[in-house]
Amino acid sequence: MRFLLLSPELFLAEGGIARILRLYLKALCELAGPEGRVDSLVLNDRPGLDPRLPLYTAGNLREQVGCRRDKLRFLLQAVRLGRRNDKLVCGHLHLLPVARLAGWFNPRLEYYLVAHGIDVWRPYGPAERWALRGARRILCVSEYTRRQILRFCPDLNPADLVVVPNTLDPLLAPATVAPAAAALRGSGPRILTVGRLASTDTYKGYDTLIEALPLVRRVHPNATLRIVGGGDDEPRLRRLAQQQGVTDAVTFTGRIDDAALRAEYAACDLFALPSRKEGFGLVFLEAMIHGKPCLGARAGAVPEVITEPVGALADYGNIPEIAAAVTDLVQHPRDPAAIRARADSFAFPAFQRHLAAVLLAP
């Protein structure tokens, strides 16, 4: 089997979409088999091979093309590569019209969309609707995302929308992180959150964690919050920490590598991301595989991932409820084995089986 993967980015950024599309690349390279090949076309990444690429390609990658945000080059390359492949997997709705255009030059090419979250929770333009109608299947990361697509495009056949949950990158599974984790641990409850600190992503709820921290510290005076990630919203969040009087209890680590991230997960007492617009919430799995309880918002697809045995939910923006949930997770620890078992249900082999069942179906 010959596959073409279209991605907005793979290695340029560390957002959730880039991380999951690396795993799509890994799965496609393994599904292609010894006689198959995979081509990868990326809109935003720079030309050349990222040193991490071999970790995801299993020797079956035929060509990797980065277009450095050149949309015309991306379109022309999609047509060229589409001519020699059997199936095209499109990693973002914005790229889907390109996938349909590629099909004009190869009538046997079937294309599929990976639908994540807020990228598809909205009304669609004419070109997007046209492209959606031509998709062989739409792979939704959650049932919530599936319902949102049908809400905004009700003329689609519901049977063509299938749920393929996100998966955990095996590279982020626990490794030998004990010394690094021990160096990070403090004397009080340690709350961890991870993500891009972008001014366009204020819905993530980092500010609500900062606002809840003074309430948490009334019960646990040594509680701290570590915010992993960088972006243009960091100055605002730093000012908020100062206004709340918790500057000394909030640490901004900036962007870190995978080894440091594993150490952060291992060292924390709980993970929190009270976001109101998560199509899945990949970071929850990353925390769960380390046996850490998770706090999320009662919104989007998060309730599909966080269940009572592994964490807690709070209404988005409800500061007292967020603080109470954090306190409950500290005072009533969840079973790490049960948490890891929940993460294991989303492990890469299960993801690969789900994907194969869709892509290889007659």
Residue ranges and their predicted role:
Residues R255-I256, A263-C268:
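Short alpha-helical donor nucleotide-sugar binding micro-motif in glycosyltransferases
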Residues E308, A312-I319, D328-P333:
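Conserved acidic donor-binding segment of nucleotide-sugar-dependent glycosyltransferases
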Residues Y144, T167:
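Carbohydrate-associated surface elements
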Residues P293-G296:
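Short hydrophobic beta-strand element within catalytic cores of glycosyltransferases
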Residues P235-I256:
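Nucleotide-activated donor-binding/catalytic signature segment of Leloir-type glycosyltransferases, i.e.
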Residues L4-L6, A183-K204, I210-L213:
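Conserved donor-binding/catalytic core segment of Leloir-type glycosyltransferases
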Residues C90-L96:
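Short His-centered aromatic/hydrophobic patch
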